[in-house]
């Protein structure tokens, strides 16, 4: 398995490529036409200096791309060269002559050529097989075979069901955490538990987003379901991190990204997660820890984040914010008498709500 950082870059590249060839795009329509006609085809997206080195013969077209043009030109034996954007057909019926010493795991001539050209030029190369009836994408060392839309929809719907289950578990864990925060009983074990729940939900979301990109226009309903299920999930996870990271950080999303880049194996290692949050690996799971209060303060309606920052800066931790009088809150920069009362009442309502939720 590749190292995580390299894997993250690969996923980013694949994500953009899948959007480029997704259903609903002119390129995908043309590719599907070629596939149905059983003619096969080889398409290179981009025409840089490295591509020029491997292209021989053919004829210059330089015309606007259309699915019909691609279909007709694919009837010829040679490869088709598109512009970087895919909006123009530059050359047709060209012969590709990549370096034969470049390794290839493919057996068929078309796919072997496609893989070598992709490695040599760094461009996206698309091989359409008339025998296997599949479309394969190559770029550098990446290879991806496009899947049937029905198959992807099935996988996406299964992932949505899994997401719903994990979201339910996360909600229960968060409700328990809310009550513990008001009671000053949060332990490092609780923090790790919530971190794991957030991360699992976000990983499933990222997997579904890949399906959505590959589905193109067919993935609209799946996208709506994800939005309905986990709106602002990253923002809430980032506030949770700001609450419990040892040293204050300006951008919790950087740390959240590091968490998402971790392998599943590392994520299960408590000491690695501790280190990410700035705590020593020897930290006792049963030790108590106080939240700063970002996440709960953010739940108070119409309380801007700069004001939340000022409150946390003034009092340090959530218990001190809860204990503060309206007069003490009023002294914080940006908070007047009305807003001070609003914070007091907002925290009280949250405390009562979470107490009732826990009783249920």
Curated annotation (Swiss-Prot):
- Answer whether the UniProt record assigns the keyword Membrane to this protein: no
**Job of this protein:** Participates in a DNA-damage check-point that is active prior to asymmetric division when DNA is damaged. Forms globular foci that rapidly scan along the chromosomes during sporulation, searching for lesions. Its ability to scan through the chromosome rapidly is due to its non-specific DNA-binding. When a lesion is present, DisA pauses at the lesion site. This triggers a cellular response that culminates in a temporary block in sporulation initiation. One of 3 paralogous diadenylate cyclases (DAC) in this bacteria. Has diadenylate cyclase activity, catalyzing the condensation of 2 ATP molecules into cyclic di-AMP (c-di-AMP). c-di-AMP acts as a signaling molecule that couples DNA integrity with progression of sporulation. The rise in c-di-AMP level generated by DisA while scanning the chromosome operates as a positive signal that advances sporulation; upon encountering a lesion, the DisA focus arrests at the damaged site and halts c-di-AMP synthesis. Does not convert GTP to c-di-GMP.
In terms of domain of life, where is this protein from? Answer: Bacteria
> By what name is this protein known?
DNA integrity scanning protein DisA
- Protein source organism: Bacillus subtilis (strain 168)
Q: Which cofactors does it use?
A: Mg(2+)
How this chain assembles, per its entry, is: Homooligomer. Interacts with RadA.
Q: Where in or outside the cell?
A: Cytoplasm
This entry's Gene Ontology molecular function terms read:
adenylate cyclase activity; ATP binding; diadenylate cyclase activity; four-way junction DNA binding
Recorded catalytic activity of this chain's protein = 2 ATP = 3',3'-c-di-AMP + 2 diphosphate
> What EC numbers are recorded for this enzyme?
2.7.7.85
Its encoding gene is what? disA
Stored InterPro entries: DisA, DisA_sf, DNA_integrity_DisA_N_sf, DNA_integrity_scan_DisA_link, DNA_integrity_scan_DisA_N, DNA_integrity_scanning_protein, RuvA_2-like
Recorded phenotype for the gene knockout or disruption:
Decreases c-di-AMP levels in mid-exponential phase from about 3.8 uM to about 2.8 uM in strain BG214. No change in sensitivity to methyl methanesulfonate (MMS), decreased survival after UV irradiation in transition and stationary phase, strong decrease in competence. Cells lacking this gene show a reduced c-di-AMP level compared to wild-type and cannot properly trigger the DNA damage response. No effect on antibiotic sensitivity to the beta-lactam antibiotic cefuroxime (CEF), upon overexpression of the c-di-AMP phosphodiesterase GdpP increased sensitivity to CEF.
An example Gene Ontology biological process:
DNA repair
The conditions that induce or repress this protein are given as: Expression increases during late exponential phase and at the onset of sporulation. Transcribed under partial control of SigM ECF sigma factor.
